[in-house]
């Protein structure tokens, strides 16, 4: 043990138990450095470095880098962060389990111990991303959707049930139990973690990474955690540090108090707007100020949940008494007293509201000025005041086509269509989906109870939801339905069609299910811009439903209100929402619940026993899960005929070095604009029959009704590489006025599917690049957006800016992210995407190095030369690029192969199946197996 660890070590005692810790208070005293000047979130990183010093992965110098954090530094060092936990959801978790299973097979084939591949940190997977809203509006909807879910996903779930038994320190929360971040908040997270190390119980703060961008929700309880790609999570699971550059920390000072009727949803949409404008991408955000005193823990969690939408790495609330009360009230009181003492000894307990650590920048938000809000129609940061919605939607209809509008003509504005069988006409703005969904809001009891109260008052007035609105209630945990039932508000919601459809992500991630066919026909007949209103966290175009172009985020209370109105072309102050039994106009003000009404109900319907009951059997799962058959043993047998799960091919040519990283004669696969999301790059929703992924499934005997979604097939790289850049709403600027997954094949000028063109380039040995604008890769922490890019043969992306997780994922797959400098972009440089690109001198590249890019016009030979910043932000990023990715680097470490090998991309697709792995060509992992044979000799 290092001297500094010995010096700072002390013990605390609680309820007769002794706990060791490494004290930041003692560290501060011994070194004469003021730890309290550091933001709380940086202090958590400091404790992590101090506790994990081993002279190998974490060195004392790494701890000093954090201790010396400077709020105004122009450059920052890299540290090896050691998260205590990993959380995963099934869309990102299935491919991770497939990777681990394939690695085990490789070791076994080499005569080694398959247990060498096993999680070394606690890992939990919550299955929540697969349930779809096929059935709604009835008491049987839940059972029908669950049955359909298991019918579609039996093979995937069997794999995960196998993993539940096959891996140590790996738990699976079965489907139907809740949403990952709400389950994490209510059950998995602890007020403090305890681990027995060399016979001593060491107590320390919770830290984690998760394979979902909204992992940040846990920042609401003072846990430092954020979303990463699946490949990064796998590395952490296998005991690797998470290498990160110390961030700037933006302090957000809350003052005042929310007005009555204004909710946490209204606040977080305001915060998202403000921080997007301020610019916090890649930075920590930390909340402080006297305004925190009035925010409940669920309010804080709602704000932390949407951290990816405002672009930060974390949105952190320090631990205080509100935090510990939450753990007490949710059946996790065992360690509360010990945790309090630990946090105080670590200088991590917020006691003085006036305390103001040093921040890189400060943003002030007066809570009393926040008003009722929505966000849309296409981005979470585009806030619209509730009272301005009618005007804002009208403006969006005629605003030029793009991020803010739909570009309708006067003639198009007049269109409407009849919905057959309903005696109703719909027009622009008609609400086709109203969904109470997402952990963002369903984790907050005040919002759900508010929606129930609005429903109750609407029922008392005799109001009805418009029949063309698809309504749904999908809570993030079973606690929600317990307290709604206890408050007698669940029947009120059901009476308006908000029946329980599932405990999962559903509409929020695009699993809204099909609209009724007569509604679809009416939309298509008049080419209508219809709307969705959901309590989710993302509203990117094409995400919620392919037939809905205007998507608004709102509180559950607003969701019920717009379901009643039937349109977003509605003034909530001036327009009546309906008529009562006597024919009198009813206005929203007549039925809107007050903050006081909600609080009065909340105080007597929620208790810790609800959480105890909901989570007592959470790992047992539903009857369907218990009946599900799963393989036994340490090894998973891949089935070469499966269209869901295949042995991944990321390690083909793994053992071969690539001595030349330079990119020569690359062509542009896509030329994209601003705010291209990971949904655009790798959609999670429906698979169109005519697209390459649909054709692949048909060729393997899968009927259209059984296609399921892209997200559910992430265990099969053949489907996913065909689904890359296959979003039906993506716009490739290489083509004029074309929407969807198409590109121009430069060698003959033809329009082709992106996948088909990429494979032709691959056959000819032509490397590829992508040109993009600002905020490239915004949205979900979808590692398949990078994996698919890699498999298509893309060597580099050149963009104006990147979202944090996607940049990291690209590097993790051996794809070079480059950034324009000096305010340049494709337009200012005169690039049209037809050029051939040369990017040289990459073999000795350094972090954040300026590289020279040559763009040669193929007809005139005119060359445009410009500089670009290599977004390899740390030394380890360079290693990943040279080795071809994170997992390749990890495997080289495991196998003791110290020589540098260069990235080699391949799109040759061979599954392991049951083929003879004695032949290196029969399985991509056979090459790895040969390394293991040397290792285990």
From Swiss-Prot:
Its EC number is 4.2.1.3, 4.2.1.99. Disulfide bonds: none annotated. Binds 1 [4Fe-4S] cluster per subunit. Residues 898-921 are annotated as: Disordered. Its cofactor is [4Fe-4S] cluster. It comes from the Bacteria. Pathway: Carbohydrate metabolism; tricarboxylic acid cycle; isocitrate from oxaloacetate: step 2/2; Organic acid metabolism; propanoate degradation. [4Fe-4S] cluster binds at residues 439, 505, 508. It is an enzyme of class 4 (lyase). GO terms for molecular function: 2-methylisocitrate dehydratase activity; 4 iron, 4 sulfur cluster binding; aconitate hydratase activity; metal ion binding; RNA binding. SUPFAM superfamilies: Aconitase iron-sulfur domain, LeuD/IlvD-like. Pfam families: Aconitase, Aconitase_C. PROSITE patterns: ACONITASE_1, ACONITASE_2. One of its GO terms (biological process) is tricarboxylic acid cycle. InterPro entries: AcnA_IRP_Swivel (IPR044137), Acnase/IPM_dHydase_lsu_aba_1/3 (IPR015931), Acoase/IPM_deHydtase_lsu_aba (IPR001030), Aconitase/3IPM_dehydase_swvl (IPR015928), Aconitase/IRP2 (IPR006249), Aconitase_4Fe-4S_BS (IPR018136), Aconitase_4Fe-4S_dom (IPR036008), AconitaseA/IPMdHydase_ssu_swvl (IPR000573). It catalyses: citrate = D-threo-isocitrate; (2S,3R)-3-hydroxybutane-1,2,3-tricarboxylate = 2-methyl-cis-aconitate + H2O. Keywords: 4Fe-4S, Iron, Iron-sulfur, Lyase, Metal-binding, RNA-binding, Tricarboxylic acid cycle. Monomer. Belongs to the aconitase/IPM isomerase family. Involved in the catabolism of short chain fatty acids (SCFA) via the tricarboxylic acid (TCA)(acetyl degradation route) and probably the 2-methylcitrate cycle I (propionate degradation route). Catalyzes the reversible isomerization of citrate to isocitrate via cis-aconitate. Could catalyze the hydration of 2-methyl-cis-aconitate to yield (2R,3S)-2-methylisocitrate. The apo form of AcnA functions as a RNA-binding regulatory protein. This is Aconitate hydratase A. It comes from Francisella tularensis subsp. holarctica (strain LVS). The gene is acn.
